[in-house]
């Protein structure tokens, strides 16, 4: 005999289900649950009087070797580029082993995830689970960035640097084999996935090649070192030879040629264009039009996202500091001014929303904020819904198309671009369990818990001397996965395939999981999930007006945002 209950009763017990919608933080974005992989009446729930008990939802006969998982997240709402749905998530050996229904196969039908004596439970009822974020534009200026990134839901950092040196403060580059070795050694201490870019500014193939053998997962070309056509061509030759990615910050001053010369030098080869909007750097005023090309994998950084009344004012001073410019030198001021164009900044929000720009990253401490990739991603999505309206296919209390487009920008698309999508970037079976758990009202702002390879590394935690975990002060703190040898087993250092094959792990005495990047050269804009539009883009050289397929695009700066002061005292 079946038992009926109201949707509210069900949501209180097990979390929302198929047909329900969840508001994301204080935005106007609503995630609509498309399906439920759990079974009504057989929900796996932990706690006093609940179902995960010996002989009920927990099988105490089967062992770990017989399929029992290490960790299960129960009744979670999954938000991923693959869909928005409800399911249990099984984790074994640090990887996602199954997504579906958990429980005891001895007393329940159609069990995908076996809960046993060896299983730890994380309650996902009324929680949202996303893949860990990937930030591909990181200046490794200070190691403290890593805690800030983790606390925001970022689990992979890709970029370059050696600390607060002038080269690092301006460019995301770890130059040469010695510096790469030192940063790979330093990476051992951090409970986060890391990959380092070598310097691509060279017309010497051997000088570029030695960095790939030293473990660089790619090359970065930056205008401050000279973004010449020769450097572009040589870096891409190395990329094609060793299956690595090239990232580029193009020539703002157009000293080495205009955007057309850069496009010619790239010569239809795939490349990741940083600062495609131009405010952070790149051919003035029309670098933005490069996003129309199918071989370009475009990203933009978070200081210009979303466009607000403060965006223009803060950029000049940031630019002067980050690029070693002097306010008393007129040429330096003119250089800075040439980058900051409200017309292209206003167009950036639109291009992100249309799926023309495929990724969002930080530009950490070098005009961007490492802890705000996720916040600004969703602020932009909310701003666009309010200013433009729902995307095609979305409707009242259902913004799934927009939500899936935007989550892809900081998860799967950066992973595909830099050759790590086999390991991370989405909630799919076989990938490492880099997962972020959110309370819906704090979604995108403050994670409830961050898992690395299935182990909790960061979580909200209260006073350690309290009788329960939640008394104030209640804030993000490192957990056991961030200490001791667990750091090495719960996180990954990415290296080039040739360095991996030459056993760089043993040569440098690395203890972390070391994995090679792969499949970066035979991809295109069409591989960017839900963000693969290639319209014609024009920029007026006098007015900086941006047109997409002949239509002017712009948006208003806003003075109020969600996910902001409501959540932060400072």
From Swiss-Prot:
GO terms for molecular function: nickel cation binding; urease activity. GO terms for cellular component: cytoplasm. It is found in: Cytoplasm. Substrate binds at residue 222. Pfam families: Amidohydro_1, Urease_alpha. Binds 2 nickel ions per subunit. The active site is at 323 (proton donor). Ni(2+) 2 binds at residues 220, 249, 275. Residues 132-570 form the Urease domain. Ni(2+) 1 binds at residues 137, 139, 220, 363. Coiled coil: none annotated. Pathway: Nitrogen metabolism; urea degradation; CO(2) and NH(3) from urea (urease route): step 1/1. Carboxylation allows a single lysine to coordinate two nickel ions. The modification N6-carboxylysine is found at residue 220. Its EC number is 3.5.1.5. InterPro entries: Amidohydro-rel, Metal-dep_hydrolase_composite, Metal_Hydrolase, Urease_alpha_N_dom, Urease_alpha_subunit, Urease_AS, Urease_asu, Urease_asu_c. It catalyses: urea + 2 H2O + H(+) = hydrogencarbonate + 2 NH4(+). Its cofactor is Ni cation. The keyword Ribosomal protein does not apply. Keywords: Cytoplasm, Hydrolase, Metal-binding, Nickel. One of its GO terms (biological process) is urea catabolic process. HAMAP family: Urease_alpha. Belongs to the metallo-dependent hydrolases superfamily. Urease alpha subunit family. Heterotrimer of UreA (gamma), UreB (beta) and UreC (alpha) subunits. Three heterotrimers associate to form the active enzyme. This is Urease subunit alpha. The lineage of its organism: Bacteria, Bacillati, Bacillota, Bacilli, Bacillales. The gene is ureC.
């Amino acid at each position: 005999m079946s038992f009926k209950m109201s949707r509210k009763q069900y949501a209180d017990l097990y979390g929302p289900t198929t047909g329900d919608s969840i508001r994301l933080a204080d935005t106007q974005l609503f995630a609509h649950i498309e399906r439920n992989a759990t079974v009504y009446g057989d929900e796996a729930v932990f706690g006093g009087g609940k179902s995960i008990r010996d002989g009920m939802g927990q099988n105490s006969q089967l062992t770990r070797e017989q399929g029992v998982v290490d960790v299960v997240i129960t009744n979670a709402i999954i938000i991923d580029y693959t869909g928005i749905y409800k399911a249990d998530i099984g984790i074994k050996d640090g990887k996602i082993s199954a997504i579906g229904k958990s429980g005891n196969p001895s007393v329940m039908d159609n069990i995908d995830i076996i809960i046993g004596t060896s299983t730890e439970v994380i309650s996902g009822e009324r929680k949202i689970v996303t893949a860990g974020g990937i930030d591909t534009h990181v200046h490794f200026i200070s190691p403290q960035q890593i805690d800030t990134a983790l606390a925001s839901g970022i689990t992979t950092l890709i970029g370059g640097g050696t600390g607060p040196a002038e080269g690092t403060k301006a460019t995301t580059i770890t130059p040469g084999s010695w510096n790469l070795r030192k940063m790979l050694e330093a990476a051992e201490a951090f409970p986060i996935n890391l990959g380092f870019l070598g310097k691509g500014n060279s017309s010497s193939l051997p000088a570029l090649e030695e960095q790939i053998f030293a473990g660089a997962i790619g090359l970065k070309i930056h205008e401050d070192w000279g973004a010449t056509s020769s450097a572009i061509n040589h870096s891409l030759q190395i990329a094609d030879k060793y299956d690595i990615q090239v990232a580029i910050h193009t020539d703002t001053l157009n000293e080495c040629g205009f955007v057309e010369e850069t496009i010619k030098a790239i010569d239809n080869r795939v490349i990741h264009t940083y600062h495609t909007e131009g405010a952070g750097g790149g051919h003035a005023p029309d670098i933005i039009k490069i996003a129309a090309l199918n071989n370009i994998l475009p990203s933009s950084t978070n200081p210009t996202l979303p466009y607000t009344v403060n965006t223009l004012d803060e950029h000049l001073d940031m630019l002067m500091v980050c690029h070693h410019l002097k306010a008393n030198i007129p040429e330096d001021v003119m250089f800075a001014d040439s980058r900051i164009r409200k017309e292209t900044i206003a167009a950036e929000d639109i291009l992100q929303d249309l799926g023309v720009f495929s990724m969002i990253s930080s530009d950490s401490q070098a005009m961007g904020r490492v802890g705000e990739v996720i916040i600004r991603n969703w602020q932009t999505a909310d701003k666009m819904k309010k200013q433009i309206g729902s995307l095609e296919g979305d409707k009242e209390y259902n913004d799934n198309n927009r939500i899936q487009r935007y989550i892809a920008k900081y998860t799967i698309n950066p992973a595909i671009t830099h050759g790590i999508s086999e390991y991370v970037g989405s909630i799919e079976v076989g990938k490492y369990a880099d997962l972020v758990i959110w309370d819906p009202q704090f979604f995108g702002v403050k994670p409830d818990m961050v898992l690395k390879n299935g182990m909790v590394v960061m979580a909200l935690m209260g006073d350690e001397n309290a009788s329960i975990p939640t008394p104030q002060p209640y804030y993000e703190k490192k957990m056991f996965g961030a200490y001791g040898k667990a750091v090495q087993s719960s996180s990954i250092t990415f290296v080039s395939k040739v360095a991996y094959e030459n056993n760089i792990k043993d040569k440098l005495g690395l203890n972390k999981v070391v994995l090679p990047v792969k499949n970066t050269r035979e991809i295109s804009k069409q591989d960017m999930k839900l963000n693969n539009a290639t319209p014609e883009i024009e920029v007026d050289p006098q007015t900086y007006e941006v047109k997409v397929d002949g239509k002017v695009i712009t948006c208003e700066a806003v003075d109020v945002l969600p996910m902001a002061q409501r959540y932060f005292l400072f």
